């Protein structure tokens, strides 16, 4: 294993676009979207995705400005350490690595759940294990080969969603399905399409947030992009709107064809979980198409895990380079792959997905925990951007010299900061006093863990919040 210490800039714009799409469109859309409909009703789910979508847009513009100015595989972990406080960057890095490990575990568990459609009598963990080995092999390849693989996997995913939307619309308007679907009744079920009122809406925000996680991979791919100054802004503009429209239209189609009370939708009491995409085809009488759709969804979930593995590995690699983790994590193989970081992430994920054996309650807890750590990452991006822009102005630099300028500053990052903070704090306190108190305690632990990482590093290295005039605005890593 050769320590070359540098990843390689072999990712083209189409790779970057599809890696971010692939990392975002996966379990969140193909399985957990059913949970938002089940718990908040059709329009409660749509409203939750719109709410989170606005917040994510502001986060994306903040990240885009920093990523084009200073492309690095450490992304917002590096930005937090450079523009705020080294301790802040350290905490962000480990938080995001934890987020990635949990997210991959969720995706791998999802892969096992999806295979139950064909093999209901076999343990789901067998297929989760096979998927783990597969994504490890893909990530061992040189980054160019990885990018090409993810490009085609994500292309299949996008085509699938477009076909699903087309068939769904034909069903809604009565062309398909032989009139078996009562669209009006499904969309107005509950309290005019809402279930649980405000609490139902707030309760699914974490799940909706989980669905949008992966958009921040755009910043991480900048470190291996051929021309980040041009590719990142173009990719960012196309990625966000594609993701938002895919989610909103898919939720509406699913809610129109499936009643929110359908027991096959993901919820804490589910015993036989099925993708809402597969349920749609079964409901309109396309049994063969349902099986094909399930197979495509399986590849999509593996694609999502594949992208997140890429991002998590790069974050751990960056921590190793910056002495925030053992040095060997900052080493690369001859093909530029941070092998030790990849191996460590795979081992953690392999252990974590076993928790999926204990049922949908634990599975939903993992989704919430993954979402919460993701919200902390988005919060960190917003804080870093505010500090970056203030330092940029304080040091007399011209805004027109920025490769990409966030349009809504300072409104955008401030709103994103307030929204992420409010959602992260406004979890479900009642869980701490219910039979699921252990899961509630573990979920809330994500915030104190971040705080301990921050102040622990601060205490050990005696760091401070960097004065604006002293912030390092050089464009070299």
Curated annotation (Swiss-Prot):
Database matches in Pfam families: AA_permease
UniProt GO cellular component terms: plasma membrane
Q: Which domain of life is it from?
A: Bacteria
Is Coiled coil among the key words of this record?
A: no
Where is it localised?
Cell membrane
**Transmembrane stretches, start-end:** 16-36, 40-60, 86-106, 126-146, 156-176, 192-212, 238-258, 284-304, 337-359, 364-386, 408-428, 437-457
How does this chain sit within the bilayer?
Answer: Multi-pass membrane protein
**InterPro entries, sorted:** AA-permease/SLC12A_dom, Amino_acid_permease_CS, APC_YAT
Any GO MF annotation of the entry: amino acid transmembrane transporter activity
Q: Which Gene3D superfamilies match?
A: Amino acid/polyamine transporter I (1.20.1740.10)
Q: What happens when the gene is disrupted?
A: Deletion of the gene leads to strong reduction of histidine uptake.
Keyword terms: Amino-acid transport, Cell membrane, Membrane, Transmembrane, Transmembrane helix, Transport
Q: What does this protein do?
A: Involved in histidine uptake. Has low affinity for arginine and lysine. Plays no significant role in the excretion of accumulated histidine.
| Entry similarity comment | Belongs to the amino acid-polyamine-organocation (APC) superfamily. Amino acid transporter (AAT) (TC 2.A.3.1) family.
This protein is called: Histidine permease HisP
- Give the species this sequence originates from: Lactococcus lactis subsp. cremoris (strain MG1363)
> What lineage does the source organism belong to?
Bacteria, Bacillati, Bacillota, Bacilli, Lactobacillales
């Amino acid at each position: 294993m050769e320590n070359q210490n540098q990843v390689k800039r072999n990712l083209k714009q189409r790779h970057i676009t599809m890696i971010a799409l692939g990392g975002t469109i996966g379990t969140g859309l193909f399985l957990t979207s059913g949970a938002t409909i089940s718990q908040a009703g059709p329009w409660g789910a749509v409203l939750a995705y719109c709410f989170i979508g606005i917040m994510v847009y502001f986060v994306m513009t903040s990240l885009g400005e920093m990523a084009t100015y200073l492309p690095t595989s450490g992304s917002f972990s590096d930005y937090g350490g450079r523009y705020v406080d080294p301790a802040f960057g350290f905490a962000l890095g480990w938080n995001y690595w934890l987020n990635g490990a949990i997210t991959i575990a969720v995706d791998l568990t999802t892969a096992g759940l999806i295979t139950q459609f064909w093999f209901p009598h076999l343990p789901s963990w067998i297929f989760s294990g096979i998927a783990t080995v597969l994504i490890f092999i893909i990530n061992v390849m040189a980054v160019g080969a990885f990018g090409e693989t993810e490009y085609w996997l994500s292309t299949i995913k996008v085509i699938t969603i477009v076909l699903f939307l087309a068939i769904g619309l034909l069903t809604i308007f009565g062309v398909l399905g032989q009139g078996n679907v009562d669209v009006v009744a499904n969309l107005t079920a509950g309290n005019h399409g809402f279930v649980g009122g405000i609490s139902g809406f707030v309760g699914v925000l974490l799940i909706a947030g989980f669905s949008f996680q992966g958009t921040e991979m755009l910043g991480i791919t900048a470190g291996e992009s051929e021309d980040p100054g041009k590719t990142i802004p173009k990719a960012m503009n196309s990625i966000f709107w594609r993701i938002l429209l895919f989610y909103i239209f898919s939720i509406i189609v699913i809610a129109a064809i499936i009643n929110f009370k359908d027991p096959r939708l993901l919820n804490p009491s589910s015993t036989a979980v099925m993708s809402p995409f597969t349920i749609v085809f079964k409901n309109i009488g396309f049994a063969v198409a349902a099986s094909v759709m399930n197979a495509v969804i399986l590849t999509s979930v593996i694609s999502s895990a594949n992208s997140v593995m890429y991002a998590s590995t790069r974050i751990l690699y960056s921590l190793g380079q910056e002495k925030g983790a053992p040095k060997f994590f900052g080493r690369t193989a001859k093909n530029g792959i941070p092998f030790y970081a990849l191996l460590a992430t795979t081992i953690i994920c392999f252990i974590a997905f076993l928790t999926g054996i204990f049922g949908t309650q634990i599975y939903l807890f993992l989704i919430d925990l993954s979402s919460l750590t993701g919200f902390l990452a988005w919060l960190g991006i917003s804080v870093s951007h505010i500090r970056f822009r203030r330092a940029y102005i304080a040091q007399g630099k011209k805004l027109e010299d920025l490769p990409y300028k966030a349009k809504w500053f300072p409104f955008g990052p401030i709103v994103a900061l307030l929204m992420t903070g409010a959602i992260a704090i406004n979890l479900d306190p009642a869980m701490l006093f219910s039979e699921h108190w252990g899961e509630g305690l573990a979920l809330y632990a994500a915030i104190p863990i971040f705080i301990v990482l921050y102040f622990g590093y601060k205490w050990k290295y005696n760091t401070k919040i960097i004065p604006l005039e002293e912030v390092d605005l050089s464009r070299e890593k």
